[in-house]
Structure formats: structure tokens, C-alpha cells
Amino acid sequence: MMIIRELTPSDRESFFKLTKTVVYALENKDFLIPMTEEEADNTFRDNSKDVVLGAFIDDILVATLGLFHDIRDYTEVLPDNYISLKGAEIGEAMVHPDFRRNGLMNQLVESLQTYILNTPLDYLLATAHPDNISNHLIQKAGFTLLKVFERRGYTRNMYIKKLH
């Protein structure tokens, strides 16, 4: 039975275990920029504004998708008319290799979109390696390609979705 719920600080170890499994299975390791320990400390604290949803099957974390409010990494690549608006990034999209192609990411996207309806956000950002299949899911979710840029030394497509 699958359950989707928000990850808590007690899920941190499971999150990093999933990350390690996903990165190990990737043919192109550039597809995923793993969360750093510092980012995890900020995300998995009790009063964080960030939200990471997890799909659990038999109490095992098999997929994640997060909403991150700290988008300072992107301010220099955003169009000027977005700088004063409230935005967040959708990221940490991972599915365990044994559970891919089962619609888990689509279910996480739907759950996160429901959560986003209750926020004051004006836009969302999403990034993906240009060759990653996730580009199709991002576009299917209504995002528009904004530009190609470098993030932490990795080439990424940056997508944007205006909410209002």
C-alpha cells in the first residue's frame, strides 16, 4: 500500500538512503545534484517552510518531491519582472529504480500542486539536466523553458510556471 506524506526530521536518514540509491543507479550522475548536509539541516528542521513529500510503500521511502523557498541561487538568472515576486523551486524529484514507471512522480506532483494552492506563491521554478527524461514531466506540468544555465557546475534547463 502506498502512502504520500510530508517528510519529517525523522525521515532524514531514509531520504539520504534513497538519494544514494538513486545516484548509484543513474547512468549519468549529472542528472541529480544531491541535497547537501547543510540544505538537509535547513529542510528537515521542524520549523522549515520547505516541504518534501515522500511516497512510502510498506513504510519504505521510494520517491520524493520537494518545494523549496530559498531560491537565492537563481536570482541572477531570473527575469527582472520576477525578482520582486514570491517564488519557490520544485526539486529533489527522485524515484527508487525499482519503482520507476509506476506513476509515483505524477502522484507526488498532484499532491504538491494541491499544497501549493494554499500558498501565496506567484511562480514556481524547476530545473533539470537537458538530457534527463524529467524535462517531459516538467513541461507536462505546465512549466515553460526559461533558459539553460550552470548551477554548481552542472548544466540545467530552468523552467518557470506563473501561478497567478
Model-inferred region functions:
Residues 2-17:
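A short beta-loop-alpha structural element at the N-terminal edge
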Residues 17-34:
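Helix-loop element at the rim of GNAT/NAT acetyltransferase active sites that forms part
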Residues 30-57, 66:
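Active-site rim helix/loop that mediates acceptor-substrate recognition in acyltransferases
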Residues 60-92, 100:
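Conserved acyl-donor/pantetheine-binding loop and adjacent beta-alpha core of acyl/acetyltransferases
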Residues 90, 124-128:
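Conserved hydrophobic beta-strand within the GNAT/NAT acetyltransferase core sheet
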Residues 118, 130-148:
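Conserved active-site alpha-helix within GNAT-family acetyltransferase domains
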